[in-house]
Amino acid sequence: MLQPKRTKYRKMHKGRNCGLSWNANVVSFGQYGLRATAHGQLTARQIEAARRSISRYVKRGGKLLIRVFPDKPITKKPIEVRMGSGKGNVEYWVAQIQPGRMIYEIEGVSEDVAREAFRLAASKLSVTTAFVVRTVR
């Protein structure tokens, strides 16, 4: 699964996920893309599950590009532990998603294959998405 090899700090503030995506919001590398239309977080497991479903559907055709990376650690305290005594341990990693962010891109397949592959992948993700086609080459 995806996670950073090394980080400067182990834990991170919660922060706020607001605004629109100003980078990675157009299809840059492939012909078709899956764009987020809502705010949310994608865990490394969700990104991997969606990648597998796309790969299974397109089989050996096409090239898939993942445009998001889970670089934010989410911590959690163990069950039945009292409040206080510091922040919990890192449980999993997430990528913060804003509306307009391109999540996946694919090339080398027909539009209906790409559309169906992204439909299968979208059911694995926790944000609403839209299928987009590259306009300018």
Swiss-Prot record:
GO molecular function: rRNA binding; structural constituent of ribosome; tRNA binding
Keywords assigned: Ribonucleoprotein, Ribosomal protein, RNA-binding, rRNA-binding, tRNA-binding
The keyword rRNA-binding is annotated on this UniProt entry: yes
Any single biological process term in GO: translation
Domain of life: Bacteria
Signal peptide: none
GO cellular component: cytosolic large ribosomal subunit
UniProt key word Ribosomal protein: yes
Subunit structure, interactors included: Part of the 50S ribosomal subunit.
Family according to the record: Belongs to the universal ribosomal protein uL16 family.
Role description: Binds 23S rRNA and is also seen to make contacts with the A and possibly P site tRNAs.
Protein name: Large ribosomal subunit protein uL16
Organism: Xylella fastidiosa (strain Temecula1 / ATCC 700964)
Chain's gene name: rplP
